[in-house]
Amino acid sequence: MFRTMMKSKIHRATVTHADLHYVGSVTVDQDLMDAADLLEGEQVCIVDIDNGARLETYVIAGERGTGVIGINGAAAHLVKPGDLVILIAYGVMNEQEVKEYSPRVVFVDADNKQIELGSDPAHAPEGSGLITPRMLSTLEASRESSLV
């Protein structure tokens, strides 16, 4: 059996530009592509944190060190400059590959510079203000006890 697994994620990147008059794709800083193990032409899902839009496209390499996250083509109707997005790539793996593979999870700052690289898809960096799904039962318990 084959499974579709998350292989890479660039988390909470800021869209630097959106250009409707382009053939399509997302332009990503080559440094971020390397960190996330993304290849030019690879399919990615883009999730817009600000408006909930989800779309699929492919990656085009952007200039290293620029922090570029550029939305190109029709997707510019859905994702705007300044929006926070998550770029996710999936891979189809057999059972053995699933056991051996670790995803690449890249966290970036407001300028799209890498601040953390890990492999836990549910990790929330300290000080990020994000909540990991693995903490939900602990959070619910603390909320309930504060209501008593």
From Swiss-Prot:
It is found in: Cytoplasm. GO terms for molecular function: aspartate 1-decarboxylase activity. Keywords: Autocatalytic cleavage, Cytoplasm, Decarboxylase, Lyase, Pantothenate biosynthesis, Pyruvate, Schiff base, Zymogen. Catalyzes the pyruvoyl-dependent decarboxylation of aspartate to produce beta-alanine. Pathway: Cofactor biosynthesis; (R)-pantothenate biosynthesis; beta-alanine from L-aspartate: step 1/1. It catalyses: L-aspartate + H(+) = beta-alanine + CO2. This is Aspartate 1-decarboxylase. GO terms for biological process: alanine biosynthetic process; pantothenate biosynthetic process. It holds the Pfam family Asp_decarbox. Gene3D superfamilies: 2.40.40.20. Is synthesized initially as an inactive proenzyme, which is activated by self-cleavage at a specific serine bond to produce a beta-subunit with a hydroxyl group at its C-terminus and an alpha-subunit with a pyruvoyl group at its N-terminus. Its cofactor is pyruvate. Belongs to the PanD family. InterPro entries: Asp_de-COase-like_dom_sf (IPR009010), Asp_decarbox (IPR003190). It comes from the Bacteria. The modification Pyruvic acid (Ser) is found at residue 25. Its EC number is 4.1.1.11. One of its GO terms (cellular component) is cytosol. SUPFAM superfamilies: ADC-like (SSF50692). The active site is at residues 25, 58. The keyword Cytoplasm applies. Heterooctamer of four alpha and four beta subunits. Binds 1 pyruvoyl group covalently per subunit. Substrate binds at residues 57, 73-75. The lineage of its organism: Bacteria, Bacillati, Actinomycetota, Actinomycetes, Mycobacteriales.
